[in-house]
Each structure stands twice: as C-alpha cells, then as structure tokens.
Amino acid sequence: MPGRSLQQIARIAAETLPSYSYDNYYCIVHAGICSLTIRTAVGHPTSLRYPLIERENKVREILQTINELKITFRNRINICTIAPASLIKFFVTRHPTVPLPRGLDKEQDALIEDIFFINSIIKQLNSDWGNPNINLSGRLFSHSKKKLRKSRKRSHKRVTKLKECHLVDGIHFSDEIRDICFRLITNTAAAELIKLYTPPSPLTQESTTSDSQDDL
C-alpha cells in the first residue's frame, strides 16, 4: 500500500481480518517511512521531512500501533521491519557529492536512528510471538548501524546511502528488489499458514497424553 502509514495499514488490517474465519488467516504488514515523515513542498514538490520537534510522538505512535496489532492478532500477524526506501530525493541522492540543505543532516541521522530502534522492537515482538522476522530493510541499506556510527565519528560527511542497484531513479525500487520482497513475503506467509493449521501428528498427541497422565 504505497503512501499509507503504518496506522492506516493497521486500521485496514483490523477491519479486514475479522471478516474472515478465525482459522484461516495470516497477515503480513509492511510500511515504509511515510509512517514517520511528512510531505512538504519546501525545496521540492515531493520531498519528505522528519521534524525533530515531533520525533518522540511519532515513534511513540508507531510503537503503540505495533503493540496493539500484536495484542489483537497475536501470531497471526507478522510485522515487517520498516524499509526506508524513500530516504527519498531530499534525504539521499545518487550522487554523494550533492550537499545536503542546512539542518537536514540532523533530520537524516535522527530518522535512521529511529528506524533502527523501531525495527529492533518489531523484531523482538515477532520473536516473542513466534513469528519469523522479514528483514526487508536489511536489503536496502548499504551500511550497518555500527558502520554508520563509526563513519560519522571519522567524518561529518553524509555516509548513509541505499544500495543503488535496488533503485531505478534514486527513488523507486527496481524490478529485482520488488521480486525479492514479494517472494520473501509470500513464501513466509505460506510456510506460516502450514505451520499454524497443520494438525499435530498422532505421535505428538500420544506423547502429550502420556505426559499429562504422568503429571497426574
């Protein structure tokens, strides 16, 4: 759902899932950085900004939404890590020599830091509920958090970038990364559905019965 925030996607999921039988759904939710950023006409008609004054509220809203989804749908909903494909135009260009506007480097650093933090919470929640982590963001960043921190200490230059081979025009995904993400999501959903709805084998049932009798 391009251009939709996590809150909007969560609302759609909540409205859609209950209309299906409780025993036959598995939902994978994925949202990008539009959950955090705002669209602005300053500098470029389609540029995005990450106002530092709203930073704490934005992150709190995201974490609240994620927690509510997990509490409501438990292991039947899998939340993908946020893939910030759009550190779009205004944040990341294909040419690292292009200087950032004044103050924007702080926004960029804050956005990346918060994305890493939110993704760590998503991974922990998925792990707590037995869901596999679909790490789409790892396929887009060219540096790890540790490398980013080290690079910043060595230099004040902008060091964050996306893997250019995955971006057609510096903004949009290539067909290659779309295919990878689609296969990853559908394969995970199929495997999880099989796991959720495969009845236990007779051997497992016998073992459980035997254990319960021993307890008595």
Regions found by a protein language model. Name each.
Residues M1-Q64:
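Conserved SGNH/GDSL esterase-like catalytic core that processes O-acyl groups on lipids
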Residues L87-R139, H166, G170-D179:
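Substrate-gating cap/lid alpha-helix
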Residues I71-N78:
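A short helix->loop->beta-strand "cap" motif at the edges of active sites that frequently abuts
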Residues C80-A83, D128-R152, E164, G170, ...:
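Acidic carboxylate-rich catalytic motifs and surrounding loops in phosphoryl-/glycosyl-chemistry enzymes
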Residues F91-V98, L148-T160:
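Short, flexible, mixed-charge acidic loops at enzyme active sites
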Residues R152-L216:
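Histidine-centered active-site loop/cap adjacent to the catalytic His
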Residues S35-R39, A85-F91, F141-K145:
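Short catalytic/ligand-binding loop motif for oxyanion handling, primarily in non-cytosolic enzymes
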